[in-house]
A protein has these predicted regions:
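Bacterial N-terminal signal peptides that target proteins for export
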Residues: 1-10
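Bacterial N-terminal signal peptides
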Residues: 9-18
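Tandem repeat scaffolds
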Residues: 23-265
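Short, flexible coil/linker elements and helix-boundary hinge sites characteristic
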Residues: 1, 19, 56-57
Length: 265
């Protein structure tokens, strides 16, 4: 069917999020044509999407091309959007609670203030997306969020850990390299093996978060709250661990990798 994603695209996305083969997401980008209609054109209008949502409580929007649409304020709760194309779409203030966003392409999209509580973002491509102030409480995230803006976002109880059960293509985990998580609420989040190289975590709430084996090289945690956070074997090479709140109550901070090479006050 015209406009539907070829299997090679899905495979390329999965390959971009695994270890150890792919640590550079640009490798995945080079394997697909991002200027093709699949990635740039929409097959529906906002009005058609809204009508479908009104007519069916849980419509199937999987693999739909919604690129560039303004879908702000719409309610996609529990809707199946698996494999949909939402590049450069505007979703500000929209609701995606419990929605399936697995394998979604949402490059440079705007989700500011959107609610994605309990949503599934497995193998999703959110690179460069704006998720500032979004609510991802208890969401499952294992995708590419490199350079994404998550400042002030709510990720309390979210699961960003590596998928240790399905490793046929390698280690699937959230990739947040150079992402902006300034002031984000990550309390109680599971970030075991999550990759956050050079991420901005200044002022973030990491209390009771699981950071075991996380990659935090070059990350800025200035002023972050780390009470009860588990740093066992997290790589903190060149990370800024300055003015941490609750550092004495953090777990296994002394067991973090390359702690002697971190920037500390």
């Amino acid at each position: 069917m015209t406009g539907r994603a070829p299997s090679l695209i899905a495979l390329a996305l999965l390959a971009a999020l695994v270890a150890p083969r792919v640590l550079h997401a640009q490798d995945m980008m080079s394997s697909v044509n991002l200027s093709s209609p699949t990635f740039t054109e929409a097959e529906m209008t906002r009005e058609e999407v809204a009508a479908l949502l009104d007519a069916d409580q849980r419509p199937d929007l999987s693999l739909r091309r919604l690129n560039g649409l303004d879908l702000s304020g719409l309610d996609f709760s529990k809707v199946n959007l698996r494999g949909a194309y939402m590049n450069k779409a505007t979703l500000t203030g929209a609701t995606f609670d419990g929605a399936i966003l697995d394998q979604v392409w949402a490059l440079d999209s705007n989700w500011s203030g959107a609610s994605l509580k309990g949503a599934s973002l497995f193998a999703a491509q959110f690179r460069g997306a704006n998720l500032s102030g979004a609510d991802l409480t208890n969401a499952r995230i294992a995708g590419d969020l490199m350079r994404a803006n998550l400042s002030g976002a709510k990720l309390a109880g979210a699961d960003l850990s590596a998928d240790m059960k399905n490793q046929s293509m390698g280690l699937m985990r959230a990739v947040l390299d150079s992402a902006n998580l300034t002031g984000a609420d990550l309390s109680g989040a599971n970030m075991m093996r999550t990759r956050m190289k050079f991420a901005k975590l200044a002022g973030a709430n990491l209390s009771e978060a699981n950071l075991m084996l996380a990659e935090l090289a070059g990350a800025d945690l200035t002023g972050a709250t780390v009470t009860g956070a588990n740093f066992n074997e997290a790589d903190v090479t060149s990370a800024k661990l300055v003015r941490l709140v609750g550092a004495h109550q953090a777990r296994d901070l002394d067991k973090a990798k390359n702690l002697d090479r971190a920037i500390r006050n």
